[in-house]
Amino acid sequence: MEVKAIHRGARISAQKTRLVADQIRGLPIERALNVLTFSPKKAAGIVKKVVESAIANAEHNEGADIDELKVKSIYVDKATSLKRFTARAKGRGNRIEKQTCHITVTLGN
């Protein structure tokens, strides 16, 4: 049995989120939530919400026992960038790209 949760368009870069995703890949659910709770990174809070959503999907849709679940796969894909401009000297402007990503978590036995 596999249960999936996806967060599309998370307002954080994929590179920063992958650092957190690599820490919990393959861990049991309880241990993964502990790692995410005590991590100081911004991405940890976002990934934790996606994992909790996947747990809720497992309970509600599949009737699964959450004690047996573990993080089967987690991957982070780059999404579209929000393009912004900032003012510079002499009437010029520089482009700023605000990165977004898609976070996909799959839980299984």
Swiss-Prot record:
The keyword Acetylation does not apply. One of its GO terms (biological process) is translation. It comes from the Bacteria. InterPro entries: Ribosomal_uL22, Ribosomal_uL22_bac/chlpt-type, Ribosomal_uL22_bac/org-type, Ribosomal_uL22_CS, Ribosomal_uL22_sf. Keywords: Ribonucleoprotein, Ribosomal protein, RNA-binding, rRNA-binding. Part of the 50S ribosomal subunit. Belongs to the universal ribosomal protein uL22 family. This protein binds specifically to 23S rRNA; its binding is stimulated by other ribosomal proteins, e.g. L4, L17, and L20. It is important during the early stages of 50S assembly. It makes multiple contacts with different domains of the 23S rRNA in the assembled 50S subunit and ribosome. This is Large ribosomal subunit protein uL22. It comes from Cupriavidus taiwanensis (strain DSM 17343 / BCRC 17206 / CCUG 44338 / CIP 107171 / LMG 19424 / R1). The gene is rplV.
